[in-house]
Every structure is written in C-alpha cells, then in structure tokens.
C-alpha cells in the first residue's frame, strides 16, 4: 500500500522539483557566479545584457538578498574577463536594447534571471526571436522545464542552465536539432571539480545543425507563375472568406505543381539538405502586398504568400519573389536566385503605310537641311556669277551727256567747235553688262539641277562651272544615290514604326496614343511603381487614370495573362514585370509579335523566409554553391529549352493540321507574308500618288494660266474699245 502511494506521488514530486528553483547559501553563490562566467565566456562574445527582476515564484526577502549578492559576484567576475555588460531592472528598457541591436544587425546575448513564462509572450509579440539574439535563462533546478509547460518556438534561440548537483551545471539548447519541435536538448555541461566546460564553443553552430534537416517537412506557398512554377489548381474556388488566411483553410485548397525552374530548385535543395516540402496555395494567388485599412497602409501586415511567412504559417517562399525595402520589414531573403531587371513588353512595331515609302528615306532631321540647301543654292550661285561684274567696275571719263531724251556726245562737240567750248571731263563708274534676269535664272537652274531635269549651262565662268559641278555631284551621287539605296532597303525590308522601348516613349504613348500599362497585382513591380520616383510615379498616376470607373483596372492576375492580352490584339497595351518572366512568356506566343523594352532597373529574386530564420545561413551556403557552379543558370536555360521544344512541337502539330485545312493554310501563308514579302507594285504606289498629285497641280496651274490670260485679253479688249470711243468722241 505504501509502495503504491510512493509511486503515485513520484510524478507530483518531480513536477514540484521541476518548477522550483534552488536557493544558494554559503559558497553556492560564488560557485554559481564562476559557472555562469565560464558559460558566458564559452559563447565567445564580448558583451552581455542582464535582466534581473524580482521573481514571482521566489518573492521572499532571503532569496532576494542572496540573489543580489550572487549578481554582484557574477558581475565582478565577468568584468575581470574584460566583458561589457549592461544590467536592466525594467523589461521595457531591456526589450528596446534588443530591438536596437537587431536593427543594427548586431548579435545580442542576454542573461535573464527570471521565469521564462513571464517573458516568452512578450518576446514573440515584439518579434524579438531572431538568430542574432540568444536568451540564457538560469533555471537553477535539477531538470529543465517540461515542453508541455514551456515551449521555446522557432526562431527564438534559448539556452536553459540547470543545476543537477553542486558545482555542476547543464546547458540545454532549443535549436540543437533541426526538426523544429522546440524541445530542449543537452549540448554542454560545466563541472567545477574538473576542467570546467566540456567543449568550447558552448553551443553547436547553426550551419552544422541545419546542414541536414533529417526529413523535416516545410510548408511552401505557391501559385501559377511560369516559368518559375506551373501550377494546376484542384479546387477552383477563389472567393475570399473570413477563414481564407487560416492554415486549415489554406491546406484544404490542393494544388498540383507540374514543373518550373523554382520547383526544380526546391527539389534540388530538398535532396541536398534532406527535407521534405508540402505545397500550399498562396492566398489570393499572389506574392503579397501591404494591407490597406481605411486608406492607410499597415506596414506590419502583408497579404499573399508573404503574409503566410509573416504569420508563421509557412516556412519559405519561392517563385521570383523580388526584394524590396517594404518586404524586408516583414520577411528576410536568402542569397539571390535570379539577377534580373525590370522591363515592359508591348506589341511588335507595326508595319508602316507603304504609300509613304518614297518619303521615309528622308527622316525628320534631314528634311530641314535639304530644304535649306535647295533654297540657298540659287542665291549662292547668283552671288558667284554676279560678284565678278561688281569687282570689275572702274572709273572712266563720260563722253555722253543726257538732256532729257537727248544724248549729247561731248567729243563731237569739241571737234566742231575748237577752242570755243571748254568742258571738264566727268568720270563715271563703268562695268560690264550683267545678264538680264540673272537671279531668277539662277534659282530655276538650281531647282532643275536638284530635281534631275535637263538644263543648259547658265554661265561660262570657271567659278560658275566649278559650282555647277559641285551641285551636280551633290545631287547625283549624294542625294540621288543615298536616296535610291535607302529606298531599296525600305522596299526589301518594309519600314516599321519606332519601337516603344524606354520609359519616356511609354509615357508619351500613354499620353498621346492612349496606351494602357498593366502590372501583376501584389508584385514587386507594383511596389516599384507605387514607391518609385520621377517617371515611375508619373506612370503610376497615368495607370490610375486609365479606367475612371475602376481605379484598379490595370491589375492582371499574372504576367502570362498580360502577354496573352497583348497577343489577342491589344496593340495599345503594355505589361510591366521582370525581364526574364516577360521573355519566357513571350516565347509561347511568338517572340516576333512582341517588343521588350530596355533594362529599366536591376531587380533580384531570392528565397523568402521568416524574420530571424535560424537556417538562413545553411540555405545561403547551398544557394551560393549552386550559383558559383552555374547550376542556377543551367536550370533556367533548361526550363527555357523545354519551353522551346514544347512550342516547336505545338507549331509542327498545328502546321500539319493547317496543311489539311485550306482556310488555316491561307492564314499561315498570310502570316508568313508579313515576315518576308516580295517586291510588288503596292510598294510603289507612293510614287504614283506623287505623280498624280504633281499632274493634278500642273493641271490646276494650266487652268489658272488660261483663266488669267483670258482675263488679260478681256481687259485689253475693253481698254481698246474705250480708246476707240474716246477718239470717236474727240472727232465728233
């Protein structure tokens, strides 16, 4: 009977011992101080934060007095080891100290002389659990706390120090195993009678612990985003409900991943690091963005797959997850898996009207110079001819005097009246006679020369001949030959409109041509537009003005949907996204039907994990090895090659089907004709239009000349009739 009572009270006594801390009397305080000093030194850090609060379980004054003595002794020994320490008696100041260290990415080690239950909730609520923060709880009892009573969940790093006997201390660590069960495991111990700590450093490194996950299962959000993930949704219910973000509701939505670059990457990581993964549907089937409540953005809450990471319902997230400052506040990123750039896609430059082909060789910047050359050529030619006549003028004695209409020769008068008439000779400026209407002739001569019309030599001077040769060479070998060569190239390769490949051209097209810009909802490209400066902010304002009734009408479910929108005839649409994603989706519909812009900005994609993720270092090591060995690039190229093979197979299949169908064959033939087309008279219709316009203008001028001649004849006839009447009246 007593034996059974003893067995029944044994669990109770163990629990009581487990929840009770030992008190120190006599030399126990110095032994404890020495042990804790050696334990802290085993961490190989130079600073320590100490939180010393009155314990609720040990509230008697004796223990409080002994603890003060212990704390003083511990600080004295710690400072002898050249350690920096700061002691807090208020939890708020202690939490602020940890937050400041985390913001500066500094490792912070804390020694807490209080019960864990009173601080764990605050540590989790304030997101102070991080791989850079280590919390040492001096438990003081023989056994560590039971996992049913206290659970130290990841990413919180906790060390619990127990005292099984005098001068002996055991160190338990919650991240000694990679299985994420938050159970404490013995990793080291201290024996004051022997050599002190068993091993240094005190704790196993995260790289060694998380190098092998030993079959641990991770939850990975996923949504359809080729070429990164090809997803088939087994449950098509897409409505939002109150329990949509709960883990149970998400796991019920089954998804099936059929391929993708990041799917292959995840399989390779799982094989190398020995873990399993389970795909869950990302809420909203998006990466995630900041929630908007009452028009105000909440920086502490995200939607989509990032929201699952932030709430701890997922372990990591792949699929072209772009890095941004806003996202770094909620999650962390690994070493980048893709170095990409931002870009946008539009339709391919359309073929211009062939009727204007004869005018296109002279671009807009050439026409002013050509017109000015033709305008000033005539006056320059006139100046070259007229200048010699002006230079050869000289003063000579004038022999002729004018008296009204009479001309008097002074030499003759001197001969018939010698010594009677004394006149002084008058000097005048004499010159050779300039050709009649020289300026008009020079203008028409240059015009006929540039227009390749027949014309005679205007002047026989060597200067005029030299300039005529220069004009003829310019008109024949420069203008005519260059024009002919460019016109031939225009006929061989039909001209197309200027491509929209810069942000400035896209902005001009949205303002003047009514283009619409689309972006994937809750993506990093959308964040770039919302938080960007200059042109990005202006483009975002233009996007919101596209659809007045629907301010969010510029959202698309995926980049693939946007490319499909352009392929179905959206000639006035553009899609913004990652260049690699755009390039991959463009191949599905034919790259010759789309135009990719220049690189707008550099963007990086990486594996997203929870803040303070303990295995981020191990994951980075594997990703860096894959990057340095070129495996990531090979995986991307393999995904592209696979897509090309599928596209080619689809085209061959469609070609065989269209060969049997005359209508489909005619469509294929018309499509091929837009790529390479032979020279035909349609390309020369511009010349016939110009000839028709010239003939019409000549006919109009001829009619006007006839009309004006008849009017002049009528006026002359009326004038003659009036003169005859006047003569008749005078005679009468």
Swiss-Prot record:
Residues with an annotated glycan are 18, 235, 299, 531
UniProt keyword annotations, A-Z: Behavior, Cell membrane, Glycoprotein, Ion channel, Ion transport, Ligand-gated ion channel, Membrane, Receptor, Sensory transduction, Signal, Transmembrane, Transmembrane helix, Transport
- Transmembrane residue ranges: 370-390, 466-486, 689-709
- Location relative to the cell: Cell membrane
**Expressing tissues:** In the antenna, detected in sacculus neurons which innervate the first and second chambers (at protein level).
Side of membrane Extracellular, spans: 20-369, 487-688
Pfam families registered for this protein in UniProt = Lig_chan
Q: Does the keyword Cell membrane apply?
A: yes
Q: What start and end residues bound the annotated signal peptide?
A: 1-19
Q: How does it sit in the membrane?
A: Multi-pass membrane protein
The record's note on what follows loss of this gene reads: Response of sacculus neurons to changes in humidity is abolished and consequently larvae fail to move towards their preferred humidity.
Q: Which residues lie on this side of the membrane: Cytoplasmic?
A: 391-465, 710-732
| GO cellular component entries | membrane; plasma membrane
One of the protein's GO biological processes: detection of chemical stimulus involved in sensory perception
Entry similarity comment: Belongs to the glutamate-gated ion channel (TC 1.A.10.1) family.
What protein name does the entry list?
A: Ionotropic receptor 40a
Protein species of origin: Drosophila melanogaster (Fruit fly)
């Amino acid at each position: 009977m007593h034996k059974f009572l003893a067995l029944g009270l044994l669990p109770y006594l163990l629990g009581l011992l487990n929840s009770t801390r030992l008190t120190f009397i006599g030399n126990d305080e110095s032994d404890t101080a020495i042990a804790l000093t050696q334990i802290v030194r085993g961490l190989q850090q130079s600073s320590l934060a100490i939180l010393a609060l009155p314990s609720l379980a040990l509230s008697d004054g004796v223990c409080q007095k002994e603890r003060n003595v212990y704390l003083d002794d511990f600080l004295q020994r710690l400072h002898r080891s050249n350690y920096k320490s700061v002691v807090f008696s208020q939890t708020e100041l202690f939490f602020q100290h940890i937050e400041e260290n985390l913001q500066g990415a500094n490792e912070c080690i804390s020694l807490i002389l209080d019960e864990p239950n009173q601080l764990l909730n605050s540590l989790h609520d304030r997101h102070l659990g991080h791989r850079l923060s280590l919390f040492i709880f001096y438990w003081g009892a023989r056994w560590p706390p039971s996992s049913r009573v206290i659970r130290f969940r990841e990413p919180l790093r906790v060390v619990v120090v127990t005292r099984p006997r005098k001068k002996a201390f055991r160190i338990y660590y919650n991240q000694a195993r990679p299985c994420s069960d938050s159970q404490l495991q013995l990793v080291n111990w201290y024996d004051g009678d022997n050599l002190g700590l068993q091993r240094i450093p005190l704790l196993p490194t995260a790289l060694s612990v998380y190098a092998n996950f030993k079959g641990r299962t991770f939850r990975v959000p996923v949504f359809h985003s080729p070429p990164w993930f090809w997803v088939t949704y087994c449950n098509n219910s897409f409505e939002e409900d109150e329990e949509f973000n709960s883990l149970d509701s998400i796991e019920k939505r089954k998804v099936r991943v059929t391929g993708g670059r990041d799917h292959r990457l995840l399989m390779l990581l799982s094989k190398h690091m020995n873990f399993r993964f389970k795909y869950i549907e990302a809420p909203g089937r998006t990466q995630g963005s900041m929630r908007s409540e009452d028009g105000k953005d909440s920086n502490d809450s995200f939607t989509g797959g990032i929201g699952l990471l932030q709430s701890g319902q997922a372990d990591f997230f792949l699929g072209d997850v772009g890095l941004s400052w806003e996202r770094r506040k909620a999650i962390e990123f690994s070493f980048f898996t893709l170095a990409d750039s931002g870009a946008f896609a539009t339709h391919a430059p359309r073929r211009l009207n062939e009727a204007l082909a004869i005018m296109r060789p002279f671009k807009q910047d050439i026409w002013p110079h050509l017109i000015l050359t033709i305008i000033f050529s005539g006056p320059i030619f006139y100046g070259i001819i007229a200048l010699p006549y002006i230079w050869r003028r000289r003063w000579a004695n004038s022999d002729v005097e004018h008296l009204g209409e009479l001309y008097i020769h002074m030499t003759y008068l001197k001969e018939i009246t010698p010594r009677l008439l004394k006149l002084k000779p008058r000097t005048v400026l004499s010159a050779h006679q300039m050709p009649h209407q020289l300026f008009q002739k020079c203008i028409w001569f240059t015009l006929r020369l540039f227009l390749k019309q027949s014309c005679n030599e205007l002047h026989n001077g060597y200067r005029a001949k030299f300039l005529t040769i220069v004009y003829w060479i310019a008109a024949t070998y420069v203008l005519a030959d260059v024009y002919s060569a460019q016109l031939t190239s225009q006929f061989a390769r039909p001209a197309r409109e200027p491509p929209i490949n810069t942000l400035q051209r896209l902005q001009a097209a949205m303002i003047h041509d009514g283009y619409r810009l689309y972006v994937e909802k809750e993506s990093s490209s959308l964040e770039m537009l919302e938080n960007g400066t200059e042109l990005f902010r202006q483009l975002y304002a233009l996007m919101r003005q596209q659809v007045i009734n629907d301010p969010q009408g510029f959202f698309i479910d995926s980049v693939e949907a946007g490319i499909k929108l352009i392929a179905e005839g959206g000639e006035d649409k553009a899609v913004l996204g990652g260049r690699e994603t755009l390039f991959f989706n463009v191949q599905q519909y034919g790259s010759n039907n789309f135009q990719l812009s220049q690189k707008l900005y550099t963007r990086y994609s990486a594996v997203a994990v929870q803040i303070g993720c303990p295995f981020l270092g191990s994951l980075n090591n594997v990703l860096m090895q894959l990057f340095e060995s070129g495996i990531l690039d090979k995986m991307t190229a393999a995904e592209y090659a696979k897509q090309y093979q599928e596209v080619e197979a689809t085209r061959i299949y469609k070609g065989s089907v269209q060969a049997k169908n005359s209508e489909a064959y005619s469509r294929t033939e018309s499509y091929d004709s837009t790529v390479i087309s032979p020279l035909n008279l349609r390309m020369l219709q511009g010349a016939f239009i110009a000839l028709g316009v010239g003939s019409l203008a000549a006919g109009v001028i001829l009619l006007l000349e006839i009309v004006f001649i008849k009017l002049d004849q009528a006026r002359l006839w009326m004038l003659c009739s009036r003169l005859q009447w006047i003569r008749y009246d005078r005679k009468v």
